[in-house]
Amino acid sequence: MRYEHVCIEAVAHTLPPCVISSDEIEQRLAPVYQRLGLPPGRLELMTGIKERRWFEPGTLPGTISTQTARAVLEKSGLDHRHVGALIHGSVCRDQMEPATAAGVHAGVGLPASSLVMDVSNACLGLLNGMLVIADMIELGRIRAGIVVGTESGRDLVEGTIDSLLHDSTLTRQSIKPAFASLTIGSGSAAILLCDRKLSKTGRRLLGGAFLSDSSAHKMCAGGVETGRHGDGRPRMETDSEGLLHAGVALAQKAWEQAKQ
């Protein structure tokens, strides 16, 4: 899809206050590392991730998303009455229903005429939300829209650490699917898009494309399994190498399609 009337007017983010290093995580996993003969520094060496950030315990995604949405609206200088859509585009949410976007919409004070919904699609939620809003602007249905999301990785990492520490059957092979979970951090971002005629910046969104390889859908799967893990924290299992190869191959095909 090519756009003629869509601009990326502003981008904003909220950075979590708690810094957690890869060394700290490995120190907590010292009994596992010692039993399996894993060298310290492995986590940073294999991923390049020195540290990640988390929000304070108990922080709801919608609370942070409200702050970020307010920030992007203020940064744009756009009258909030022009915002015709608010999409919450992260994996993390305040509850199953209503949509987390509803609380953000109320917190920011956007018009009742705005479309309000969640779009949750793994790491792609914000990009998917951008295209939904861009399509609406291009069609003339709205003049502006905000897509915002907040991911909170604390519970996933903490839960993974506890599971690894209490798994007496763990081997160097069986720990691999949990490895990617130890890299997860937190953060929040928002993008405001608007009609070209409304834009002060003229920064156009030229287009977007999508392509799916659903055969790879089992390479990274996460969620809450209370019966299996004994608590309500999420866990995730990832075939990191397989996912990388599948993702790069798909990205190449999508890029070639987008250029046509």
Question: Which residues are covered by each model-predicted region?
Answer:
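ATP/NTP phosphate-donor binding region
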Residues: 60-61
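Condensing-enzyme catalytic core mediating Claisen C-C bond formation in acyl metabolism
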Residues: 1-57, 170-245, 253-256
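Acyl-thioester C-C bond-transforming condensing/cleaving domain
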Residues: 34, 70, 74-80, 94-98, ...
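Phosphate/pyrophosphate-binding loops at sites that engage ATP/ADP/AMP, CoA/4′-phosphopantetheine
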Residues: 68-84, 253-260
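Short glycine-rich or small-residue beta-strand-to-loop segments that form or flank ligand, phosphate
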Residues: 85-91, 118
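Short, hydrophobic/amphipathic alpha-helical packing segments
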Residues: 65-69, 126-130, 248-255
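Short glycine-aspartate micro-motif
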Residues: 5-7, 85, 143-147
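Short, surface-exposed alpha-helical segments at coil->helix boundaries
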Residues: 37-40, 66, 98-102, 248, ...
